[in-house]
Design a protein with these regions (language model features):
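Short juxtamembrane and helix-loop transition motifs at transmembrane-helix boundaries
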Residues: 89-97, 170-181, 195-207
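Hydrophobic core segments of alpha-helical transmembrane domains in multi-pass membrane transport
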Residues: 10, 27-37, 109-120, 131-141, ...
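Transmembrane alpha-helical segments and their short flanking loops
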Residues: 47-60, 162-169, 212-356
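Long hydrophobic alpha-helical segments that form multi-pass transmembrane helix bundles
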Residues: 36-94, 269-277
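Single conserved hydrophobic/aromatic residue that forms the stacking wall/gate
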Residues: 1-15
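Accessory "access/gating" subregions that flank catalytic or transport cores
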Residues: 157-190, 194
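Membrane-embedded hairpin module used as a gating/binding unit in multi-pass transport
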Residues: 66-169
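Alpha-helical transmembrane segments and their immediate juxtamembrane interface regions
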Residues: 117-151, 207-247
């Protein structure tokens, strides 16, 4: 498990790796990029709600959140089949407090280091070194990300103010990386619970070839769960456990490409044998589609059919999700919150005219 080959660039390169020409790869990446931008606007009111700040300019086009449509399917099933579970939901901050150090990122890194050291038959000194290295890395992942977000937030606000002033009152959002939501305790509570679940799934899941390390704190998974469920921790954990196999399979599929690229670039620390990958790299669905499109580009009819069906299903699911998010945003607007007209059903000026 290696952190981290990222985003649309990775989708682009993987298509070419699996046979797509430059034009086909570019078209698919542009298509996914457009959906990401649409999604960033759809999520903006939910971000405002989660941050309890309806004037903040921040949103994100991060590929993490393209899992939202899949998560929303399960969220709607919860609404229909298990609505009573929400009565037993609990406060994520209190859960983190109860788990304490033994469920922290540092402790999880120690567990993983010891486990990997034992199964690789290393001596006590090597196991101890590995445990503390893994613990330190896991602890630093989120801290360094939060530093970056804090550093660019004033710049983002300044850019937004400047652009809004020059565009005659048109409001623009500023896209940041996902950690501007990292202050929500639900992200870390769900990640702490999902970590041992992911390790267990990795050991028993058919077709999986990854043992999670850096990705064990499921930062490619929990932010989207937070947005769709709006912090319902039981839903986040259950849906997260259901969708984790997608990430493990996608990481296994990506391993030859990532290892080939790392060796071609003469990256340090790449083993002569075996493969490296990431267990929770964002965009698993997009990875599968990229591989199908890449293989379809070679002209095989069956792969062309599979790629076409996958793209149709992917697009249909996204626009169903868009409809559901617009319903959510309309409720925010009906409650008096400021919501852009293009992400809800009833435009503000139209509602005002009908009231007159």
């Amino acid at each position: 498990d290696v952190e981290r080959s990222r985003g649309l660039g990775d989708v682009y390169k993987r298509q070419i790796y699996f046979g797509a020409n430059l034009f086909v790869a570019t078209v698919l990446v542009i298509f996914i990029g457009v959906l990401k931008i649409i999604n960033s606007d759809l999520m903006k009111p939910t971000f405002n709600d989660l941050l309890d700040d309806w004037e903040n300019p921040m949103t994100t086009t991060h590929l993490n959140y393209m899992m939202n449509p899949v998560i929303m399917v399960f969220d709607k099933l919860f609404d229909k089949l298990f609505p009573w579970l929400d009565k037993y939901d609990f406060d994520a901050a209190k859960l983190n407090e109860k788990i304490g150090f033994w469920g922290s990122r540092f402790a999880i890194g120690i567990y993983l280091g010891i486990f990997i050291g034992l199964i690789s038959h290393q001596d006590i000194k090597s196991i101890t070194t590995l445990a503390f290295m893994a613990a330190t890395c896991l602890e630093l992942f989120s801290i360094i990300g939060s530093w970056f977000i804090a550093a660019v937030e004033p710049l983002s606000q300044g850019v937004a103010d400047f652009a809004n002033k020059r565009l005659g009152g048109r409001m623009l959002n500023i896209g940041l990386d996902w950690p501007f939501l990292a202050g929500r305790a639900e992200i870390w509570a769900a990640a702490n619970v999902l970590a041992p679940i992911m390790l267990l799934e990795a050991l028993v899941l058919p077709g999986n070839g990854i043992l999670p390390l850096g990705g064990i704190i499921a930062m490619g998974v929990t932010p989207a769960l937070l947005v769709v469920t709006r912090g319902k921790i039981i839903r986040m954990i259950v849906i997260g456990a259901i969708e984790l196999p997608l990430f493990l399979w996608a990481g296994t599929l990506s391993a030859p490409f990532i290892t080939h690229t790392a060796r071609a670039l003469h990256a340090s620390g790449i083993p002569a044998t075996g493969l490296i990958s990431s267990s929770t790299k964002e965009g698993p669905i997009e990875q599968f589609i990229a591989v199908l499109v890449g293989k379809a580009s070679k002209g095989e009819m069956m792969m062309i059919l599979y790629a076409a069906l996958a793209l149709i299903a992917y697009t249909a699911l996204f626009f169903w999700y868009r409809h559901e998010m617009m319903k959510r945003n309309q409720k925010y607007s009906d409650e008096g919150k400021e919501v852009a007209d293009d992400v809800k059903f009833v435009a503000t000026h139209a509602a005002a005219n009908s009231a007159d």
